[in-house]
Amino acid sequence: MIIIEYFHNPVCPYCPAAKSLLTKVIEGLNDIELINVDTYTEEGITRGVSLNLKAVPAIAINGVVKLTGWPFEAEDLLACINEAREK
């Protein structure tokens, strides 16, 4: 199982586009668990700090931040997912 954490906040202008792309990429992939992390919550702040997160939107895969900021492409995300599958 691959765990993807999607870091976002309600004032980020790029987060909706990142979420849309992420949703499309992982649609139909049965080995993915998606966790939405709102960095405007205490829990989200704590998790972001634990990963040394500097910006949103961001995507962590299996506990490692792989993509930060916008834009990123579907190919970038798929490459990160495939890398996680190989481990």
Which residue ranges define each predicted feature?
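Short acidic active-site motifs
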Residues: E43-R47, D76
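Local sequence-structure signature of Cys/Sec-based thiol-disulfide redox active-site neighborhoods
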Residues: M1-G28
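Structural micro-motif
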Residues: V49-A60
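Non-catalytic, surface beta->alpha helical segment in thiol-disulfide oxidoreductase systems
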Residues: I61-K87
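Glycine-/small-residue-rich active-site loops that bind phosphorylated ligands and cofactors
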Residues: P13-Y14, Y40, K66
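Thiol-based oxidoreductase modules, predominantly thioredoxin-like and allied folds used
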Residues: D31-G44
